[in-house]
């Protein structure tokens, strides 16, 4: 019974799924907002000018040091996914310069096949577009506690939820901190619902002792195993 879950959390657009599942946002409005959000983010920068790169094997503190010690390009942390997996956004010209820096330091990285530099300041036009759309959409108080991508902690107040959804567009997804917050507050079982099992892998990377179940097809519902 999903209603028994202590927390709901989603990664990036998955936060809208979490809000819909918790009863805060009805399904129709969730789809409508996501459609508008997608269009707004695609038009925030000229097509083909922005990109993202995943940096593997180093921690966020080291990434911040690299970014602080350069002045000829500007990149932004977009996703703090897990220990040793950080994603950055920026203009492609800046991303390519950053990749060269990573190569000289022999730091593993993967340039991602994305259409825009999500979750960074380059999305400010999308924020402006979505502010009114989110504020003019009806939200209810969620039945379950929501973990915000922006803060990595819980929220249940309707106006705060709206404000954080707006800020989410150009702020990093603090997934690692979100998972740690839930674990520190007593969560021992995580259930990922949706295609694939990327988030399950991230949770296990953050804490190998945590029990994780993945539901990406109906038959998975009968195979869930929870720790006491």
Where are these regions (language model features)?
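FabD-like malonyl-/acyl-CoA
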Residues: 1-65, 112, 189-222
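Acyltransferase/transacylase module recognition
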Residues: 4-5, 135-228
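Sequence-level detector for tyrosine residue identity
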Residues: 7, 16, 73-76, 181
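Alpha/beta catalytic cores of group-transfer enzymes, especially the acyltransferase/condensing modules
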Residues: 21-170
